[in-house]
Amino acid sequence: MKKILLIALFTFCGIHNTSAQEGAFNLTVNIAGLNSDKGTLMVAIYNKEESFLKKQFKGNVVAINNQKSIAVFKDLPKGEYAVSFVHDENDNKKMDTNLFGIPKEDYGCSNNARGFMGPPKYNDAKFQLTGNKTIVIKI
């Protein structure tokens, strides 16, 4: 009887652990074409249209080398996401804009989404994460 209980326990733990691992994925974001290696890159992930470019789901600040950068987000649940970044050249932790609100620093979004007379739209930047994934954003 003890043997049967132990087998059942180990089987349950194995199934439970496997399903937890199947639902957590890594997202690698490669960004290229930056103007310089100065400052840092602020990379944000969004998982809801209403929070896009307002409140990030997860964020990361990464270094820049040879006008490129890589940000890795681990253990993300399966779902719909969008990514944005700002090249914070002066490291003041915000996107600098001119008098008209036009960005002075590099920025971009997943799917290389661009806005017309305003910021990019979530629907243009969104993608599905159903496994480990690498996306490339070019300036």
What is the role of each PLM region?
Residues 89-95:
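Acidic, glycine-anchored loop motifs typical of Ca2+
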Residues 67, 72, 77-80:
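A glycine-anchored, Pro-Gly-centered beta-turn/N-cap motif
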Residues 62-67, 129:
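Short proline/glycine- and polar residue-rich coil/turn motifs
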Residues 81-85:
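A short tyrosine-centered beta-strand micro-motif
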Residues 1-24:
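Bacterial Sec-dependent N-terminal signal peptides
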Residues 36-51:
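Short, ordered, surface-exposed loop/turn motifs in non-cytosolic proteins
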Residues 25-33:
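A short, amphipathic beta-strand motif
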Residues 105-139:
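Extracellular beta-sheet/turn segments enriched in Thr/Pro/Gly and aliphatic residues
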